[in-house]
Amino acid sequence: MNYFPVFADLNNRPVLVVGGGTIAARKVNLLLKANAEVRITAQKLNAELTALVEQDRIIWIAKEFHGEQIRNVFLVVAATDDEQLNEQVFQVAESRQKLVNVVDDQARCSFIFPSIIDRSPIQVAVSSGGAAPVLARLLREKLEALLPQHLGVMADISGKWRHKVKQQLKTITERRRFWESLFNGRFSRLLKNRQIEAAKKELELQLTKDYQGGSVSLVGAGPGDAGLLTLKGLQEIQQADVVLYDALVSAEILDLVRRDAELIFVGKRAQGRQVAQQETNQLLADLALQGKRVVRLKGGDPFVFGRGGEELEVLAQQGIPFSVVPGITAAIGATAYAGIPLTHRDYAQSAVFVTGHRKADASDIEWQTLARSNQTLVIYMGTLKAATIAQSLQQYGRAASTPVAVISQGTQETQHTQIGTLKNLAELAEKAPTPALIVVGEVVSLHEKLAWFGEDKFAQKRPHFTLDSLRIERVA
């Protein structure tokens, strides 16, 4: 290795920065995060550094550099656009065996600044040794996204308990297993949810040998495209012991689940295999009570026609910790991939989401509200009742010529979008593969212009709506 990675304690140690511009300010801010005593030499300071001097956070010691300024400092940074001055700083520092960094000049660096992921006291440094700074930055961005924000507080709390854990658990193996279980279990989840005091109590309980504490995370998988799964959702499924998934979760997303996790199908469809909701609710509770990290993985968003609230009510009644990771609901994802904006200043000032699959004792639908003009109506699970939906909307004032779309398998490679009018909605729905979403409203007329996803956009001739009259024409 060309550089030996070292973490330096700069707390109250003097560091000299030569330069007063933007690059110098960037280095100064990094050094201040480490509580260094920053001394500045520069002809003039930019506004940011001037403010730091006025706040007594840094010391402006001189306008001109001379060798004596290096005598009692721990590190030296040269951050000017004057090559001759940078060379002078480097030579003086080298002659006095001081570690020096000349910014953007690898040949004149006895130490370099890595890209930093800061979850203090947890820190990760990434460096290419100056060979590929952009690559190091890209790696840092990926790690930044993958490492949860609560790592720092987790390390802080754990550090304060190390002595007590060592007293109670006598062997290294016992302590290792304890910490691994703690960091991968309910303790971590509570910290993730910002429940600090509850997490401390959990740690104390974990020291009781017969204690087992599981938890449940309700995760929205999004509409199908694995790229639309959130980073937090990805973290959850890669830490799970058990994943209960439904029929709307794509195979691509299931491939991202931790390899040794148990996968349990609990899906339901309007027609086909069914798993009773009560059975799913109880299974979630039972698995958590066994001390397992359970993920309930749902298509779309768990709180949008996903019955997520019903499942969490059961967990709450039994005192089982849970968390929720929202997902992109189908109405958002599928319409975006179909080039249909849900709102548009000229055509729709509101959007309404409804389900076509309701409880048997559900109250009557307010068709008059749903049939309003200047709004977009999105119907989940409505293809089997498309004829009734079309008839009712027309009965309450929606024109038969109102544009409609039936989007099947939204955001996936197999996505298929059919365009028509309210008059022939039932016919479109009958041909639509499931799962499918119905969109009703003038915004559908923008599909032909804004569609961007899927090769069939260019391979097929679709009905075209003129934006003023909404009269159906055929593309010549």
From Swiss-Prot:
A biological process from GO: cobalamin biosynthetic process
Functional note: Then it catalyzes the NAD-dependent ring dehydrogenation of precorrin-2 to yield sirohydrochlorin. Finally, it catalyzes the ferrochelation of sirohydrochlorin to yield siroheme.
Assigned protein family: In the N-terminal section; belongs to the precorrin-2 dehydrogenase / sirohydrochlorin ferrochelatase family.
Any one Pfam family match given in the protein's UniProt record, by short name: TP_methylase
Binding-site positions, NAD(+): T22, I23, Q43, K44
UniProt signal peptide: none
Binding site for S-adenosyl-L-methionine: P223, G299, G300, D301, V304, T329, A330, M381, G410
Disulphide-bridged cysteine pairs: none
Residues carrying Phosphoserine: S128
GO molecular function, one term: sirohydrochlorin ferrochelatase activity
HAMAP family for this protein: Siroheme_synth
InterPro entries per record: 4pyrrol_Mease, 4pyrrol_Methylase_sf, 4pyrrole_Mease_sub1, 4pyrrole_Mease_sub2, CobA/CysG_C, NAD(P)-bd_dom_sf, Siro_Cobalamin_biosynth, Sirohaem_synt_dimer_dom_sf
Reactions catalysed: uroporphyrinogen III + 2 S-adenosyl-L-methionine = precorrin-2 + 2 S-adenosyl-L-homocysteine + H(+); precorrin-2 + NAD(+) = sirohydrochlorin + NADH + 2 H(+); siroheme + 2 H(+) = sirohydrochlorin + Fe(2+)
Catalytic center residues: D246, K268
Region spans: Precorrin-2 dehydrogenase /sirohydrochlorin ferrochelatase: 1-203
UniProt key word Lyase: yes
Alphabetical UniProt keywords: Cobalamin biosynthesis, Lyase, Methyltransferase, Multifunctional enzyme, NAD, Oxidoreductase, Phosphoprotein, Porphyrin biosynthesis, S-adenosyl-L-methionine, Transferase
Name this polypeptide is given: Siroheme synthase
Organism: Mannheimia succiniciproducens (strain KCTC 0769BP / MBEL55E)
Pathway noted in the entry: Cofactor biosynthesis; adenosylcobalamin biosynthesis; precorrin-2 from uroporphyrinogen III: step 1/1; Cofactor biosynthesis; adenosylcobalamin biosynthesis; sirohydrochlorin from precorrin-2: step 1/1; Porphyrin-containing compound metabolism; siroheme biosynthesis; precorrin-2 from uroporphyrinogen III: step 1/1; Porphyrin-containing compound metabolism; siroheme biosynthesis; siroheme from sirohydrochlorin: step 1/1
